[in-house]
Every structure is written in C-alpha cells, then in structure tokens.
Amino acid sequence: LHDPCDNTEDCEDGLECNRNKCLIPYDSDKTCETGWDCVHGVWCSSFPGGSPGCRMDYRCKNEQCEDPATECVDEICGRKEGERCIGPCKAGLTCRNGYCRKPW
C-alpha cells in the first residue's frame, strides 16, 4: 500500500495505481485505515460490526455531480460553501461547525 507506481501492474494484487501510488479501489474487500489508503475521491468508512473499507465514492461522473449542493473540482464532488459537511468540502473550503466554510 502506498508504493510508488506507473500503472496498476506495478501494484500488489487487489490494489490500483492512482496518482502514482498503489491504493485500494472503491468497494474492494481490502481493509483501509484512513482515506489516504483509498483511490482519489473515495473515503474509508466502516459500518457497525464491519471492517473499514473504501466504500464512500465522491468522484464526479463525467465531470458532473448528482447532488446540486456539490460541485466537481479536481474529480471530486465537493460540498459548496454553506452546505453541511456530509461529504468532502469543495477545494479551498474546510468543515467548521458542521458546515463547509472558507478557512479562518
């Protein structure tokens, strides 16, 4: 995990080369510890009684987001300013008091 790579063949079985690192793909059976273990735009999450996995997909589909409260930036559907942090905030914003806001 996190080994440098040029393509997926450089990674151990079950991992994907993403942004030049071997990472866990979306909906894999592999266990993650943090979101940094998952491919770009996918979050590590766990359900009660289950092991953590790369199960929350926030990647844009064809550069579009289904949720109008989000905007596609850097291939991720990020929550807009003033929206609740129920997913990643748009680039340049941070989650503060439960809402996506500009940094201090």
From Swiss-Prot:
Modification(s) after translation: Contains 8 disulfide bonds.
> Which keywords, in A-to-Z order, does the entry hold?
Disulfide bond, Ion channel impairing toxin, Neurotoxin, Secreted, Toxin
Q: Which Gene Ontology molecular-function terms are recorded?
A: ion channel regulator activity; toxin activity
Which tissues is this chain's protein expressed in? Expressed by the venom duct.
Location in or out of the cell = Secreted
Q: Name one GO cellular component term.
A: extracellular region
Its function, per the record, reads: Acts as a neurotoxin by inhibiting an ion channel.
* Notes on the domains: The cysteine framework is C-C-C-C-C-C-C-C-C-C-C-C-C-C-C-C.
What this protein is called in its record is Turripeptide OL55-like
